[in-house]
């Protein structure tokens, strides 16, 4: 009898131990993604991914797929810097975007791009440094317009040019507006590719170093607030002259909104409404602006 009871108790304990534990829904709801962003090197031999760290922190890890061992190349604690994305510039160099909210005189969002090797060494600030003689501050650190495949670490980045105050000098840079520069991520040597446009808001490259589309957004009033319409211009292949392309309303989604350029087809891919829904079109950049539907979903 004693043996039978003992065996029954052991079996009952085993069943209790094997019973599934209900998940902590609150913990699962608040959990961060184990991989927040990932990218593959141009030759396919390495990956880079951003993973969370304790608190608000995050780290960039690179992995050589030959051995599969992750290496921490960079990290931030999240107070206030946030690591938002990293892209390969070459087979051994990356550019990472850092976002922060800085509270000084007022609360201001700030972005900066930093280039570094896959092992975290040789870091360089790609975003333009602010100078004391600039007429105003900007938190915009630019964005990558073209990774320039095959250029071994050089890229095209957009930049907001801030004019300098001519304090006891005649060498102040008075350029202002939205332009594009080519930057060597190792030496930081920079060349202006597109001169700043006062009301420029967007540039699209063909992926081979040629800027083919530009967007401008005029203010809606004397107060300087941006209007809702973006006017897009394009360049024919081999030309530097801007031609009208489309007008897009950011509030109503009316008009053609260009997203990418196919250099082989000499065409732009745009989103535009079709029967009240967004559809994908291909528009020729040969001067005809011939448009053909690529994809539309009935629902």
Residue spans for each PLM region:
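Beta-propeller folds
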Residues: 19-299
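N-terminal secretory signal peptides that target proteins for export/translocation
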Residues: 1-3
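Bacterial N-terminal signal peptides
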Residues: 5-16
């Amino acid at each position: 009898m004693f043996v039978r009871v003992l065996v029954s108790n052991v079996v009952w304990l085993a069943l209790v131990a094997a019973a599934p534990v209900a998940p902590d829904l609150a913990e699962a709801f608040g959990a961060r993604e184990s991989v927040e962003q990932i990218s593959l090197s141009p030759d396919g031999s390495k990956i880079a991914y951003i993973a969370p760290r304790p608190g608000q922190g995050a780290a960039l890890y690179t992995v050589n797929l030959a051995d599969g061992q992750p290496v921490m190349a960079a990290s931030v604690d999240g107070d206030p810097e946030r690591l938002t994305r990293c892209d390969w510039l070459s087979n051994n160099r990356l550019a990472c975007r850092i976002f922060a909210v800085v509270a000084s005189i007022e609360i201001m969002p700030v972005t900066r791009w930093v280039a570094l090797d896959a092992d975290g060494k040789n870091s360089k600030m790609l975003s333009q440094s602010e100078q004391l003689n600039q007429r105003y501050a900007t938190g915009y650190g630019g964005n990558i317009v073209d990774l320039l495949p095959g250029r071994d670490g050089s890229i095209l980045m957009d930049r907001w040019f801030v004019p300098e105050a001519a304090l006891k000098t005649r060498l102040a840079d008075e350029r202002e507006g939205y332009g594009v520069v080519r930057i060597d991520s190792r030496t930081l040597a920079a060349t202006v590719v597109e001169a700043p446009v006062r009301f420029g808001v967007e540039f699209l490259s063909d992926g081979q170093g040629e800027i083919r589309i530009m967007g401008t957004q005029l203010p809606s009033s004397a107060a300087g607030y941006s209007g809702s319409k973006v006017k897009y211009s394009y360049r024919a292949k081999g030309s530097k002259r801007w031609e009208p392309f489309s007008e897009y309303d950011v509030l109503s989604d009316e008009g053609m909104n260009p997203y990418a350029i196919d250099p082989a087809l000499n065409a732009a891919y745009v989103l535009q409404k079709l029967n009240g829904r967004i559809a994908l079109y291909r528009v020729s950049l040969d001067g005809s602006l011939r448009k053909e539907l690529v994809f539309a979903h009935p629902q």
